[in-house]
Amino acid sequence: MIRITSRSVKGAAGIRSVSSSTVRLNIAPKVVSPPVPPPVKPQGSEIPPPPPPPPPPPKAKRFSLFGFLFKTTLLATVVYGGTLYAATKNDKVMDFVIDKQLPFHEELIDLIENGSTEDLQEAWEQLKNKFTDVKLPTKDDIDELTQKLEHRGEDIIKETKKKIASTHIGHKSGTDLTPTEQLQRGVEIESVKKDVAHLPLIELNSDLGKSVDETVKQTITSFNNFIQSIDASSLATKDDKLITSINTSVNQLASRLNSLTKDFDNELQNKLKVSQTELFSSFTKKELELTENLLHQFSTEKQQLEAKLNQKLSQEIQAARAAISQAASNAVAMVRIEQTKNFEKLVSEKLNEERNGRLANLEKLNDRIVELEKFAEGFETQIVSNHKKAIIHQAVSKLKSLLLAPAAGDKPQPIKPYIDELTKIATDDEVLALAIKDLSPLITNESTHSILTNAQLLSRWEQLAPELRSASLLPPNAGLLGHLASIVFSKLLLPVKGVKEDGKDIESVIGRVESSLARGELDIAVEEAANLKGWSRKLANDWVVEGRKRLEIEFLLGLIESESKII
């Protein structure tokens, strides 16, 4: 907008220069006075230089009413704002503010308590828009004003041509008459009346006067000055040049207005694009923030719901298990009672029939009783076997949990009571009896924490690895010096990264054992350690024994569990 105004001012200055140049043609030249010669000083006398003037006294600081009012207003604003802010922190000050009913205290306190930087920015933008939203003339208004100026300029040119042409046509002067006519003509006194026709000035309509730019107003003013100069001058012989200059000025003004309109439209489009981009970026930012907040809330609610559902599900599962076990035991008891009742009822009916039939069909009754006894024995055997299965399964599960995966906080417990319980139950099955017989010497004297876990075996193997490295470097029949040298050189061995399947050196064996233990393949690790030879095999013998003991216990417990399922 500033560029458009400066350009329009330059255009108006050019138009005014044309009008002023036309006026200067009738102005008489100024008389320049001759230069005055400088005074001549006499050579014989010397005048002393005057003393320097005294320094001016310091000016007293004038009283400024505007500064006094500004400082007073600023101090009152700070005191008032500080009082309202203190009212939000102190109840006594709040009571004072409410009692005195300070102006706008409710709105300002609400703004201090609930206001934010975004609200202040929004209020500042609204205030800024009120001052910056100035109504500018549209393109249609500018085009309409340009057309009116062109038509008005054409009318002025036509009227100027008419008035200039009318000055040429007049009465014949005395020189146009013949000498005889001049002698015969009497002396006449003619009163000369000079009628000066004034050209119409350019005026704007009242509805366009408010929306027209200041540059256009200055241009119209220069046009009016030019018309007045035409009225005051007698430039009849230079009408063509004047008309040409007017036409060129009007054309330049029209082209300038068109260029200004285009520049204004382009700048407006650029500002609209920039504002649209800023709004889109702010909208995208707000959308991302809302999405992140919603996702965070969703994940939190999801975790809470999952925890509640898992807790509820575990409680329901435990309750269902207890209900199912109780229902099963009740069903078995009810079946036994029902069978006993049916049996007694059947026996009583048969006895009554025999009594009524005088002990007739005694053999049929005996056969029926035998069948009932077989059925009762088979049903009882099935119930006993199912009970044994359940007891064996519980005992094996308990042994596995105690031996193979003991809890760190549990106290050591003896294993013999569980073995005795299995021995009592498995008297009828040969496979179970043999498995329990082989398992008894392994864990009879052991506790729940004496069998090493995979993690403990891995830790012991890592502690044993330096000794194995030093032992692998011992020469045959090594003495004290050989042992010391092997210890020193074992420190220089670099650990092997990865697993070498075909490596027979001690580092490859150590790496394969550690990898197998990390994967839970204890049998492969024990096999690798058992294949060691020499002094290394003797050092690893205790570890191999513990690993084999764990493998044997795992195998026997798995065998007992599998056999209990097929009883």
Curated annotation (Swiss-Prot):
GO terms for biological process: cristae formation. Its main location: mitochondrion. Residues 26-64 are mitochondrial matrix. One of its GO terms (cellular component) is MICOS complex. It is found in: Mitochondrion inner membrane. It comes from the Eukaryota. Residues 284-383 form a coiled coil. Residues 1-25 form a transit peptide. Component of the MICOS complex, a large protein complex of the mitochondrial inner membrane that plays crucial roles in the maintenance of crista junctions, inner membrane architecture, and formation of contact sites to the outer membrane. Plays a role in keeping cristae membranes connected to the inner boundary membrane. Also promotes protein import via the mitochondrial intermembrane space assembly (MIA) pathway. Belongs to the MICOS complex subunit Mic60 family. This is MICOS complex subunit MIC60. The gene is MIC60.
